[in-house]
């Protein structure tokens, strides 16, 4: 990644921005930990949790302040070091800011606090911090970072002479496809069709894990690769057949690759293995739930070069390169994001198989002829959320309670779709009758387990209904009893001391305390030990 500092800005305006020029031993303990993490991800921007903020230091602070138009300040980094550049964002907004950086082609690392800061403070040491997320343009699953009606593809390539293998996946939906062919011009056109958010490419260079933003170049990239994409340069090792083949077999619990039709496609297997290794490297504790790779052949589809797609205005117009006015804009009357993404794929990759084309036409004709059936389908589909991405987040362990409710609501509608399909003649629609009955049971279980309006964030608690789990009910009862005990204590102490405004509170520093306003402090009994003095109150503990 190139140095994003504006060329017109004199380097002396950013003293200590380059941490490589500093004596590490003289840095504060926190700054030393920051640099330990930074050196593991030298080509990413590092957000480092400090209290209620995520802070960035050194050159990252300069870059982030410039790209996000944030205020840049400084922070003490050690007595003999002085101050270094610093930029910070509130912890609750870190993903919103990260999304903007990802759109600009950066990778972002989130290093969060993994223990209670009060515990570390009590033991007089630094709070433990670990990398919890590595965000790159091709590995996003959060809805607010994705375009609902467009796939977010991560692609991986292996090139050997004129032959090439390609694997690409949308980890937000689980789609995973591979292909292999000859002719580098076809590779260029396939990439232009897919418009991947990120492309992995193995190189023989010491500076691996480097990320090239759109428009940047590198001597390691062959001329056939369009420079309009974001490229992550990776080590050759995970792209070798010796590592890639067993990784693919293990990931999908296969005994051979014949079952997915790629035993004879070594370059595509290597690309798939490299992609899986990258997900292992970036997703940390979040598992990635991908479907088994689907092998396809370019000759099964009409190949449209980039110029033809542009002239035909399939997804964007020639005039201003926007969706409005394009063929996709005119045709996309779909009722779900899933349908919109599928329509985009169909337009960009037209079938050549006559049987498949007729099957699609027959389905459309049935909807045209049967107004009531069409209306019933539309009404039901409008009540179904983005099942592909909902199940993707569940599989990736990133779903929240709202996602689970949306998933259950959507699954509960599928039996009604299956019932509608009984009236249909088209094989496409008839296939809906084969929906597993277990889906309805899953929806019922979710609805019966969650409260009616669960909080969005899992850490808030209060998600599970009473009666679902006996141990949880017992713990909840104990917590409720504790709250009642505190309320009773407050009433008791008010009566004993004659202080009607006395309160019982809690903080992480010294636990439960008794609060008395400064004006009533002289009424505090002898068995109250003062622990803290504030502007308007005194805080005590009972001895």
Question: Can you describe what each PLM-predicted range is?
Answer:
Residues 394-395, 490-502:
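Acidic, serine/threonine- and proline-rich low-complexity regulatory regions
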Residues 309, 499, 511:
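Active-site lining segments that contact anionic ligands and/or coordinate catalytic metals
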Residues 1-372, 379, 389-392, 396, ...:
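Basic, polar low-complexity surface loops/patches
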Residues 239-246, 303, 318, 405, ...:
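Amphipathic heptad-repeat alpha-helical coiled-coil/stalk segments that mediate oligomerization
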Residues 323, 335, 356, 376-386, ...:
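Secondary-structure capping and boundary motifs in well-ordered enzyme cores
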